[in-house]
Amino acid sequence: GWPAYPGPNGIRSSVCQTKLGCGKKNLATKGVCKAFCLGRKRFWQKCGKNGSSGKGSRICNPVLAHAVEKAGKGLIKVTDMAVAAIVKYAGKK
């Protein structure tokens, strides 16, 4: 299934950054963190609440959606590679 939509406020990059504590523990992660949050925002904007608004787009799949949200909750370590993938996908028209 599709993960719960964080809501219009929840997908905001600034809210995401605050939640993740971007750059608090390690300043080097701030850029990566910001990029991730922006990618996550674009992902949700593109795919909508349940992925239906992104029909025909390969990025709008439940696997990626869950990965984005797990990373966003800090359950998995956000690696530069994962972030790069999310940001790259999210940037695709």
From Swiss-Prot:
Location(s) in or outside the cell: Secreted
GO biological process, one term: killing of cells of another organism
First-listed, main subcellular location of the protein, grouped into a coarse class: secreted
Keyword field: Cytolysis, Disulfide bond, Hemolysis, Secreted, Toxin
Cysteine pairs bridged by disulfides in the record: 16-37, 22-33, 47-60
GO cellular component term, pick one: extracellular region
Tissue-level expression: Localized within the skin and proboscis and are most readily isolated from body mucus secretions.
Source organism, top-level taxon: Eukaryota
Function: Cytolysin that shows hemolytic activity (on bovine erythrocytes, HC(50)=5.75 mg/ml). This hemolytic activity is completely inhibited by small unilamelar vesicles composed of PC/PG, PC/PI and PC/PS in 1:1 molar ratios (with at least 100 mg/ml concentration).
Family note: Belongs to the worm cytolysin family.
Name listed for the protein in its UniProt record: Parbolysin P4
Species, as recorded: Parborlasia corrugatus
